[in-house]
């Protein structure tokens, strides 16, 4: 309690608790880990064993330069990120489609193999949760959300599930791993180890397919959170190291390197990709958070719709914008900082 707490501080007690199979491989490649909801996650990668630890500071610390290099490599070549900490579940049953349509503000995917980004609002019209929803087959959907909010998101699902048995929930968080391949050379890399056609025509944005990566089965989703060409590879977790090794081997000729959570955060902010708990929350209306294209008021009834319409009629007081901060040398705005104009807080 009586000590200095630094930005992005990671505490060591009780760790490691939950680990993905590829963690040992990531550590050998220089990973410096943090944790979310008990899961170890690679925050950044050090270039040598001597630098493979955090040095906490309110100013830029040793990871800043290396995270920048990770971002550059993803933007110019390709990067591999472990996101097995994602919260994952399957919703199925004769009432699954109707239930999910009421749970989220966006239209859920209607065709098998399609993927939509959907937001669950609370009853006041604020943003409670964000789900990636993939339709696997009739009455069967695969849901992915932030690992830090697994309990919150899955409790919300249970809160609104009908009690008549028409909807079945299956928690897949511990049984499914996720590796994210992203960057302009990601198609070249993945094409070397799968027979699936990865062209835009055959595998468009926001679609998913069952593929084989080497000898391992995976659900490949054409999407990612860093704004580059890429795929999320969701797989039975026992196949993870096989998939990881195949990708790293195939990527040698394309400058494939692992990247961590901090590089992902930097890249997603550049694209104004939002997160629940930072840019989105229950304190702000979905429209204030810039979710206009993800909220379909004309689709029919859904949780929070009427409250959101009422909020809209009264008028919004806030608007989410991306703020660029220039001429910074050794200390950065890390989020949740007040913004002043003429000594007045404006955001």
Place the predicted regions along the sequence by residue.
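Glycine/proline-enriched, intrinsically flexible loops and inter-domain linkers
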Residues: 1-347
């Amino acid at each position: 309690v009586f000590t200095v707490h630094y930005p992005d501080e990671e505490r060591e007690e009780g760790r490691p608790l939950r680990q993905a199979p590829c963690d040992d491989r990531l550590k050998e490649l220089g990973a410096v880990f943090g944790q979310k909801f008990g899961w170890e996650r690679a925050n950044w990668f050090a270039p040598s064993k001597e630098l493979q630890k955090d040095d906490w500071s309110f100013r830029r610390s040793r990871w800043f330069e290396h995270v920048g290099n990770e971002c550059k490599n993803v933007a110019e070549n390709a990067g591999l990120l472990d996101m097995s900490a994602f919260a994952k579940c399957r919703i199925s049953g004769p009432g699954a489609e109707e239930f999910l349509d009421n749970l989220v503000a966006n239209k859920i995917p209607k065709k098998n193999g399609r993927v939509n980004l959907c937001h669950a609002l609370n009853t006041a019209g604020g943003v409670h949760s964000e789900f990636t929803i993939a339709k696997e087959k009739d009455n069967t959907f695969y849901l992915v959300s932030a690992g830090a909010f697994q309990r919150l998101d899955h409790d919300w699902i249970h809160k609104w599930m009908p009690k008549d048995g028409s909807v079945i929930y299956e928690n897949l968080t511990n049984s499914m791993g996720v590796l994210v391949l992203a960057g302009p050379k990601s198609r070249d890399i993945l094409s070397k180890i799968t027979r699936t056609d990865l062209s835009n025509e055959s595998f468009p944005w926001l679609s998913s397919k069952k593929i084989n990566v080497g000898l391992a089965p995976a659900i490949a989703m054409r999407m990612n959170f860093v704004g580059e060409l890429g795929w999320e590879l969701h797989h039975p977790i026992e196949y993870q190291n096989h998939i990881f090794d195949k990708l790293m081997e195939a990527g040698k000729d394309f400058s494939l390197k692992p990247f961590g959570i901090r590089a992902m955060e930097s890249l997603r902010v550049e694209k104004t990709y939002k997160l629940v708990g930072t840019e989105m929350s229950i304190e702000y209306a979905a429209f204030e958070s810039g979710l206009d294209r993800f909220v379909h008021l004309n689709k029919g009834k859904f949780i929070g719709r009427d409250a959101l319409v009422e909020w809209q009629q009264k008028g919004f007081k806030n608007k989410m914008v991306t703020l660029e901060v220039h001429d910074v040398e050794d200390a950065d705005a890390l989020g949740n900082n007040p913004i002043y104009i003429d000594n007045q807080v404006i955001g």
